[in-house]
Amino acid sequence: EYLSTEKKYDNEIVLKGSDIQRYGMTPSGNYIRFVPESFQQVAPIEMYRAKEKLLYRFISEVPVFAYDDRQTLSLNSCNIVIPNIDGLEMKYVLAILNSSVAAYFISKKFNSVKLLRSHIEQIPIPVVPMDVQVSVIRRVDRIMNSSENTSGLYKDLDSDIIELYGLS
């Protein structure tokens, strides 16, 4: 009654975990009539409608995060996190969370394919000057806006993030 694969006048796109890739989303054509008071389990509406947020796969071998500034709705296989860390831009945090360092940390510290908020909160995030963040964000934007194969861009960004941790 609420979910549909057909776009109608009273529904909107809803994302599942499998719709989330690193840095991006590929909606699979699912729509929802958003009536939160009728749902069994729903996050606070402000989280869905936040000006910017990160979406991530709840179940995944490695952390997979995407940036959303379109107030997109999501099902419970696609969780929301809104990093509010003084001095750190959200897209910078996105790059850190999508890095091989974060994946390694999660794999060694937690024995689970479920990525919990408490796991994310324990990932150490390098505090860097704004010019370094801007450089990272430019590359994140390139990855997010590219229609070409982004594996090379991703590897270069990941190498730089490894350096931010002093691990190179």
Which residues make up each language-model segment?
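Polybasic, glycine- and aromatic-enriched phosphate-binding surface used to engage nucleic acids
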Residues: E1-V134
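Non-catalytic DNA-recognition/assembly elements of restriction-modification systems
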Residues: E1, G17-S18, V127-S168
